[in-house]
Amino acid sequence: IHVRVPLVEGVNDDVENIRKTAQLCQELKNCQELEFLPYHRLGLHAYRQLGRNYQLEEHASMSRWDVYQKMGFLCETDWMFDIAISGLEVYKAGIGKTGVTEEVLKA
């Protein structure tokens, strides 16, 4: 199982929610990866063209670095699954934090 969680600033990016999400993955027998997806506003234009209300319009886009700053504390705990941010692995099960740098996360 690969669990993918979009993080939206001010909606589900608090420490408690992130910790509970990881704990839920730990309880799943077949969870191989928890992947956090930074919220983006790329669909805004399409919603406007369709005349639809974009309910998250007031929320700012997040970068990988923004997400790492919110969830990086998870890399200090032993988990039975990998952790990634938009496909970039930041934690490897059984090994720990990967060598990903701030520069890479900000790119």
List PLM regions with ranges.
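Short beta-strands and strand-loop turn motifs
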Residues: 1-7
